[in-house]
UniProtKB/Swiss-Prot annotation:
UniProt source species: Escherichia coli (strain K12)
Record-level GO cellular component terms: plasma membrane
Disruption of the gene: reported phenotype: No change in sensitivity to excess L-cysteine. Cells produce about 15% of wild-type levels of hydrogen sulfide in the presence of excess cysteine.
Gene (name only): dlsT
Chief localization: membrane
Name of the featured protein: Probable serine transporter
């Protein structure tokens, strides 16, 4: 039913414009694609194309193309659905300042701090991974190309200075972060696409391999599922993105529409590019090269440089440096945004138990979080902890934070019952598979 107003005719309540209390013309004006939308698409792609993408073809080569295809059939649709549900559960929340406050609004303060802590642990692991990776890799490249005589990473202060610079950039606001990330992310995307295309001339059908027995196929597909998902996963940026849109837009419907649109665009670009890249590398590289890369603990790019001769090898070497550094830097920015938001949620949850909310100095809290993030990242750098060995526990955390918790909210909160359906069952199954995947890998 349409209702007349001084701004025009309000659209039918069954449409997004109607739910937002707007006319169709007002709705079209409100959802216009702008620089902020572009920025969040860029940040999401930057988060997804992290350091792990250079190892994806190795995992696919080890397990076989059939395993990857089955894993993709399960993983990519499920990932799209659970990221969509994650956005919807955040956007529906009456209070949308940070992830723990959203959970608190739905389930109470105790659940908010418990599930917020789980989300926090996931982001701490990635803070460890990316802060250590960017310190060691940048120092290694500077030494390799003769810029420095020794490794700068041997000095603890190199890592401290580097992290301070990255955190300072990340904390200056979205506009600066979007500007810095745009060039790096577009370069990464073009590099990944170019690498996939460059391998087409070396495709061999025998690298497709034979179809393995059903039991082994399913088991290996579940083991490969975390690698498939994390190749284009950007759940770490979804919470800051929704919160940003909610703070900018008066209408929840407009904020939800813009967040979902940014996610859809990023997902589509990532799926086409990364899926082609992984399949192209597998058809060119094959199982034997993947085993060699695994045994030498090197990336697909490094092994490609070994079997590509002539000028192509030099090109792959240069490209690998660009992809590696840009991938780690932009992923660090995305992780830091999520880490800052999660930490703020936990701190505010604790402080509100001790004092009235109006007496809390949020600026002081944010400065404290910056210092905490720097010290946390620096401690990982100084200890040079084998953080990559910790990343396997991220699969169950992704399963819980991205799939099982949003699904539980749908069943628990009456306002979210509208999201029940077959897609929710697929999300739940995927969440359970992510939780058991590490145990199958080591069985």
């Amino acid at each position: 039913m349409e209702i007349a107003s001084n701004k025009g005719v309000i659209a039918d309540a069954s449409t997004p414009a109607g739910r937002a209390g707007m006319s169709e013309s007002e709705w079209r004006e409100a959802i216009k694609f702008d620089s902020t939308d572009t920025g969040w698409v860029i940040m999401s792609i930057g988060m997804a194309i992290g350091a792990g993408i250079v190892f994806l073809p190795v995992q696919v080569g080890l397990m076989g193309l059939w395993v990857f295809l089955l894993s993709s059939v399960i993983g990519y649709p499920a990932m799209y659905l659970f990221q969509r549900l994650f956005i919807n559960t955040l956007a529906e929340s009456p209070e949308c300042k940070d992830y723990p406050s959203v959970i608190s609004g739905y389930l109470g303060k105790n659940w908010g701090i418990l599930l917020g802590a789980l989300y926090f642990v996931m982001l701490v692991i990635w803070m460890f991974v990316y802060s250590t990776a960017i310190t060691n890799d940048s120092a290694s490249y500077l030494h390799t190309f003769g810029v420095t005589e020794g490794l700068l990473s041997d000095s603890p202060f190199y890592g401290l200075v580097l992290i301070c610079i990255l955190v300072a950039i990340s904390s200056r606001g979205e506009k600066l972060l979007f500007k810095i990330s745009t060039g790096m992310v577009l370069t990464k995307l073009l590099v990944v696409a170019a690498l996939g295309v460059s391998m087409v001339g070396m495709w061999h059908l025998y690298n497709v391999g034979s179809l393995p027995p059903l039991g082994l196929l399913v088991k290996n597909a579940i083991i490969t599922l975390p690698f498939t998902l994390t190749s284009i996963l950007f759940i770490q940026t979804l919470s800051p993105m929704v919160i940003s849109y909610r703070s900018r837009e008066k209408s929840i419907e407009v904020a939800r529409h813009k967040a979902l649109r940014a996610m859809n665009i990023a997902f589509g670009i990532l799926f086409v590019t990364v899926f082609f890249y992984a399949v192209s590398f597998t058809l060119a590289m094959g199982h034997d090269e993947a085993v060699k890369a695994y045994e030498q603990n090197i990336s697909a790019l490094a092994i490609a440089a070994q079997f590509i001769s002539g000028d192509g090898a030099a090109w792959v070497k240069v490209v690998s440096v660009i992809l590696n550094i840009f991938a780690v830097m932009t992923a660090f920015f995305g992780v830091y945004l999520g880490f800052r938001e999660a930490t703020q949620g936990i701190v505010m949850n604790i402080l509100r138990r001790k004092m009235p909310a109006e007496k809390i100095n949020e600026n002081l809290v944010q400065r404290g979080i910056m210092i905490f993030a720097i010290l946390l990242a620096w401690s990982a750098i100084v200890l040079n902890a084998p953080v990559l060995s910790f990343t396997s526990i991220c699969s169950p955390i992704f399963g819980m934070v991205g799939c099982l918790i949003p699904a539980w909210l749908v069943y628990k909160v009456p306002a979210l019952h509208k999201y029940k359906g077959m897609s929710l069952y697929l999300i739940i199954v995927t969440g359970l598979l992510l939780c058991v995947s590490p145990f199958l890998a080591f069985s």
